[in-house]
């Protein structure tokens, strides 16, 4: 079983989402199976070398971070590694001979009709570790009570949990982004919907992507189109997956994720001035503030952009796309399975500290034979 270490990817992803880096190319080909600084002060503790001795009151930043990525977590298991997805083709229809009887004709009932069954296997994991060391004796001089010391240690553990949450959020988004990139790269008919081009062709307007989210008429058209495709993928079709497989996705199994700027624009420019809001809005969706990162300015071109390297047969291909407003997919199209968070502890008796190794591994997968649609706004090339 292939297990990929992703320390560098996880660390660079944090810079993309906290505004300290532009949106950079991410290689997902091995991830998704398809105040003031304290300086020059001698009165500091001997543990983290940052805490001032004998402070009257210390306030700890112990705020727990709540993740915002869409939930695509599947079940977990202890033994075995491979995920197997089994499917079968639709059987062909034959004539009903009960209503076509002829004198003296033989009707053969002993024909074997073999089911056309297919299976896909997913057998790769990613893994990372967040280590942090703790001590008590060496840092006691920085606090006035055991309560303060425990609050400090609690803050450190919360920081570890927050780091895990933000990085797992990023990995979930990478799972979605990898599928999005696969669809954009394949450029197959009804899997990639340029809402802006459709709107301009339908209305005769010449709207640009820069103005689209402030145009109520466009937003109404976009909501109409998205709702139409939700009805369409509920019916059996081969048009909405890369494998050309007969698939249908009932509303209960649909997962719609939209850019929060688009969702907010719909509420402000459209729903706020509409009496019958249910007739014009999209519903039952998750929203995300960006797909891959914020850039340094949180501009639309950054938050609506993906720049990833994906598997393309035996090679990798870079896919760059801006203007992505949303994705609609079957709940079986992608997910996170066999997740295994755990903590191991090592005690160093000589130096009197202990280290927690917070480990996580899981399977991140895309099934390109499931329904997946990308909605975007892209200006026509000049």
Language-model segment annotations:
Residues 118-189, 352-358:
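Long, contiguous amphipathic alpha-helices that act as assembly "spine/axial" helices in icosahedral shell
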Residues 1-65, 277-382:
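Extended, compositionally biased alpha-helical segments that mediate assembly or anchoring
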Residues 103-107, 160, 230:
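A structural signal for well-ordered alpha-helices, especially hydrophobic packing surfaces
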Residues 159, 170-224:
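Loop-centered beta-sheet repeat module
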Residues 31-43, 100, 104-106, 183-194, ...:
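Mature, Sec-exported extracytoplasmic domains of Gram-positive
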Residues 207-335:
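Extended oligomerization regions of viral-like shell subunits
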Residues 1-5, 35-50, 147, 151, ...:
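Alpha-helix boundary/N-cap detector
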Residues 48-132:
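Assembly/oligomerization interface modules of large self-assembling protein complexes
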């Amino acid at each position: 079983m292939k297990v990929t270490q992703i320390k560098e990817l996880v660390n660079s992803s944090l810079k993309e989402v906290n505004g300290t880096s532009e949106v950079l190319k991410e290689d997902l080909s091995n991830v998704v199976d398809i105040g003031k600084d304290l300086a020059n002060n001698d009165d500091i503790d001997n543990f983290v070398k940052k805490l001032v001795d004998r402070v009257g009151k210390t306030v700890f930043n112990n705020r727990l971070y709540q993740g915002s990525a869409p939930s695509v977590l599947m079940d977990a298991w202890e033994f075995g590694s491979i995920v197997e997805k089994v499917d079968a083709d639709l059987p062909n229809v034959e004539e009903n001979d009960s209503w076509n009887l002829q004198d003296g004709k033989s009707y053969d009932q002993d024909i074997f009709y073999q089911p056309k069954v297919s299976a896909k296997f997913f057998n790769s994991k990613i893994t990372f570790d967040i280590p942090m060391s703790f001590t008590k004796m060496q840092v006691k001089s920085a606090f006035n009570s055991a309560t303060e010391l425990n609050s400090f240690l609690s803050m450190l553990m919360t920081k570890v949990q927050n780091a895990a949450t933000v990085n797992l959020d990023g990995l979930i988004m990478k799972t979605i982004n990898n599928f999005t990139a696969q669809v954009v790269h394949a450029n197959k008919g009804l899997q990639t919907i340029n809402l802006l081009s459709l709107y301009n062709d339908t209305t005769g307007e010449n709207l640009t992507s820069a103005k689209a989210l402030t145009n109520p008429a466009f937003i109404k058209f976009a909501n109409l189109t998205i709702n139409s495709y939700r009805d369409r993928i509920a019916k059996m079709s081969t048009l909405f997956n890369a494998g050309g497989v007969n698939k249908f996705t009932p509303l209960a199994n649909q997962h719609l994720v939209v850019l929060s700027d688009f969702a907010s624009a719909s509420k402000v420019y459209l729903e706020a001035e509409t009496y019958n809001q249910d007739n014009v809005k999209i519903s039952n969706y998750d929203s995300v503030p960006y797909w891959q990162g914020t850039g340094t300015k949180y501009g639309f071109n950054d938050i609506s952009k993906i720049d990833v390297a994906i598997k393309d047969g035996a090679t990798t291909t870079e896919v760059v796309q801006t203007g992505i407003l949303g994705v609609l997919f079957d709940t079986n199209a992608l997910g996170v399975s066999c997740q295994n968070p755990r903590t191991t502890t090592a005690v160093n008796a000589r130096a009197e500290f202990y280290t927690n190794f917070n480990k996580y591994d899981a399977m991140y997968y895309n099934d390109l034979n499931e329904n997946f649609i990308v909605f975007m706004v892209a200006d026509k090339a000049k």
